[in-house]
């Protein structure tokens, strides 16, 4: 096993003391046992727990084979999905690939350009994307359990038409890959009818926990990232976080501290990074915790920030605003690349004291200074140390946060594996759009909107 993630809770004191963590140990252990024995709410959606070791090896091999086909066939790869159907893969690709992977010259890339669609209903976004890719060789991965989710269904209609016009029906079917239910749903029916290659979304894995299934693995593999290393990292994390000793289990300690802070009125957790490539990891994390904990009038509100950028916009509020915040910093110990700051003879900017230092050194001092400043301002800080941003540590991070999320949801007394609240806006939207069966509701809503 490589070096693991490590947790520094020094700057959560005096808000949470060690005896409070120890007090929660037996409760957390009980919640973990509930997860493991599959006796709690949502127990039909716990397939993610053993995915790192019990994944479908035959399908995994097909994913890698399909990824090679896509890389050899296409200039552009379009990933169509929303929420958990795209955030995990995008988080991995942005974290591990070149920051400007889509802008590199073709001779500098060994993989297609990768763009995401079906995660909004903006006509401008779609029109701009179509304009960008219309003259390129395109492959599409449409990801939807049902095939009827509005955003990806609209996007797939548009790209299916584009590909069939461009390549004909036979040519298009070789370029469309569907990740969907094993046996039922509109997308499964269409894929079988048209002859698309398909990959299965397991019945026992919810969308926001699905990054280690074909949902995330096919786009990640197309990007050139080593999916074997991702699974290895997740498997090692699964083993490490199986300990029931709170002194050794960082998942237990993270759950204990964030929930102790929540009980003391710290109702917002900010996941903070100092690497721009972690932006979409923050978006993935927000969905994971927002949908899992935010119900029954409960839950820690998940926010994310990209420092030092957001220190120049949100820094004032974090330092002196409402004291209901705590932060979880992702500290990347070793950057992928280094840049040395050179000496300047004029020194008009006064920065020669940084000459011959690595930019990453400056970045780390900014992180350390921010932790101290915010702590002085009444904001507790959890620091999660990550040795480097690689496929292996992406797998570790995913499993760390997923397991912590499951335990934390049970600790708060909610079902962390459903999301009934997301249906409310959909019903209103369908009624206002005139979907058959919503006629009475449409009239009521139109009256309310006057």
Curated annotation (Swiss-Prot):
Biological process (GO), any one: glycolytic process
Pfam families: PGI
Disulfide bonds: none
UniProt main location, coarse: cytoplasm
SUPFAM superfamilies named among the record's database cross-references: SIS domain
Keywords of the record: Cytoplasm, Gluconeogenesis, Glycolysis, Isomerase
Enzyme Commission code: 5.3.1.9
A GO molecular function held by the record: glucose-6-phosphate isomerase activity
InterPro entries on file: G6P_Isomerase, Phosphoglucose_isomerase_CS, SIS_dom_sf, SIS_PGI_1, SIS_PGI_2
Active site: 291, 312, 426
Listed GO CC annotations: cytosol
Compartments where located: Cytoplasm
Similarity comment: Belongs to the GPI family.
Function according to Swiss-Prot or TrEMBL: Catalyzes the reversible isomerization of glucose-6-phosphate to fructose-6-phosphate.
Database matches in PANTHER family: GLUCOSE-6-PHOSPHATE ISOMERASE (PTHR11469:SF1)
Designated name of the protein: Glucose-6-phosphate isomerase
Organism: Clostridium botulinum (strain Okra / Type B1)
């Amino acid at each position: 096993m490589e070096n693991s993630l490590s947790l520094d809770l020094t700057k959560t004191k005096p808000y949470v003391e060690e005896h409070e963590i120890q007090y929660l140990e037996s409760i957390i252990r009980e919640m973990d046992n509930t997860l493991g024995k599959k006796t709690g709410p949502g127990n039909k959606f716990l397939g993610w727990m053993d995915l790192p070791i019990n994944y479908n090896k035959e399908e995994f091999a097909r994913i890698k084979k399909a990824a090679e086909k896509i890389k050899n066939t296409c200039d552009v790869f379009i990933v169509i999905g929303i929420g958990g159907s795209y955030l995990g893969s995008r988080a991995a690709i942005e974290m591990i690939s070149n920051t400007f992977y889509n802008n590199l010259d073709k001779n500098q890339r060994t993989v297609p350009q990768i763009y995401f669609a079906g995660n909004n209903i903006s006509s401008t976004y779609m029109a701009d994307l179509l304009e960008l890719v219309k003259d390129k060789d395109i492959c599409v991965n449409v990801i939807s359990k049902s095939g009827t989710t509005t955003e990806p269904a609209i996007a797939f209609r548009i790209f299916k038409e584009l590909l069939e016009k461009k390549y004909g029906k036979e040519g298009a079917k070789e370029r469309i890959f569907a990740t969907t239910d094993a046996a039922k749903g509109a997308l499964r029916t269409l894929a079988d009818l048209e002859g698309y290659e398909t990959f299965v979304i397991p019945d026992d894995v919810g969308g926001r926990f699905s990054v280690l299934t074909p949902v995330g693995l096919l786009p990640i593999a197309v990007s050139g990232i080593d999916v074997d290393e991702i699974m290895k990292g997740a498997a090692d994390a699964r083993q490490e976080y199986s300990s029931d000793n709170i002194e050794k289990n960082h998942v237990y300690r993270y759950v204990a501290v964030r929930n102790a802070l929540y009980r003391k009125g710290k109702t917002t957790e900010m996941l903070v990074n100092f690497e721009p490539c972690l932006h979409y990891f923050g978006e993935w994390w927000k969905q994971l915790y927002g949908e899992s904990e935010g119900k029954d009038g409960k839950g820690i509100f998940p926010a994310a920030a990209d420092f030092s950028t957001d220190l120049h916009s949100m820094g004032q509020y974090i330092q002196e605003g409402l004291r209901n915040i705590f932060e979880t910093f992702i500290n990347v110990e070793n950057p992928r690349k280094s840049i040395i700051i050179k000496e300047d003879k004029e020194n008009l900017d006064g920065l020669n004291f940084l000459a011959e230092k690595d930019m990453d050194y400056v970045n780390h001092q900014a992180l350390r200074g921010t932790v101290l400043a915010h702590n002085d301002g009444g904001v507790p800080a959890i620091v999660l140390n990550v040795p480097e941003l690689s496929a292996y540590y992406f797998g570790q991070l995913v499993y760390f946060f997923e397991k912590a999320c499951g335990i934390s949801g049970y600790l708060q007394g909610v079902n962390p594996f459903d999301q009934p609240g997301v249906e409310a806006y959909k019903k209103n939207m369908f009624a206002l759009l005139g979907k058959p069966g919503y006629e009475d509701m449409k009239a009521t809503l139109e009256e309310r909107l006057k």
